Amino acid sequence: METHDLTLDDFLSRFQLLRPKMSRDVLNRRQAAVLIPLVRREQPGLLLTKRASHMRKHPGQVAFPGGAVDSTDASLIAAALREAHEEVAIPPEVVEIIGVLPPVDSVTGFQVTPVVGIIPPDLHYHASEEEVAAVFEMPLSEALRLSRYHPLDIQRRGHDHRVWLSWYQHYFVWGMTAGIIRELALQIGMKP
């Protein structure tokens, strides 16, 4: 499938046909969740944020709305929805959850579960100044084009890691966020 003619219906049919398996390896790990907000349009969008530069962790980085699970969250999905509401004012009740991707281990010790949801196109985002410097939308067809991501092999704490790098307009998309977008593309059958 070519990404330039990817409709939301195409994405949904492929996502539902290729449901990801959930990991059961969650013992002794701090849990977090991010929302992958797909904007419902004929040519869908992917909503991303740029973290505030004064944040202690990952300042200025492009990210999905999300964060640590807290005691008020009934589930990982609830955590992703709560964080998206806190960070960019997406009302939880307007998000249509379509599934999750396998969890990803973060460099900060969290196991992060990406939650995929569809949001209406007419939302008015309000970035929390404490956490978010900018909110932007990238065409989903562009985000899922695997050739836009370039690998960088690094060593961290004596282990080899591959991170992915990309640019969209003036936004540098890399690390866990780029890796999650790539996994989403691979999960719906995009070819490298």
Curated annotation (Swiss-Prot):
**Single Gene Ontology BP term?**
nucleoside diphosphate metabolic process
In this chain, Mg(2+) is annotated as bound at E83, E87
Q: What is its EC number?
A: 3.6.1.-
On whether Cell membrane is a keyword of this UniProt record, the answer is: no
Q: Superkingdom of this entry's organism?
A: Bacteria
Q: What class of enzyme is it?
A: hydrolase
Tell me the GO molecular function terms. Answer: coenzyme A diphosphatase activity; magnesium ion binding; manganese ion binding
Domain Nudix hydrolase residues, every copy? 29-160
Listed A to Z, the keywords are: Hydrolase, Magnesium, Manganese, Metal-binding
Necessary cofactors: Mn(2+); Mg(2+)
Pfam families for this protein: NUDIX
The record's section on InterPro entries has: CoAse, NUDIX_hydrolase-like_dom_sf, NUDIX_hydrolase_dom, NUDIX_hydrolase_NudL_CS, Nudix_NudL
UniProt entry tagged with the keyword Magnesium: yes
The cross-references to SUPFAM superfamilies, in alphabetical order and at most eight, read: Nudix
Q: Motif Nudix box: which residue numbers?
A: 67-89
Give the protein's biological function: Probably mediates the hydrolysis of some nucleoside diphosphate derivatives.
- Which family does the record claim for this protein? Belongs to the Nudix hydrolase family. PCD1 subfamily.
Could you identify this protein by its name? Uncharacterized Nudix hydrolase NudL
Q: Which organism is it from?
A: Enterobacter sp. (strain 638)
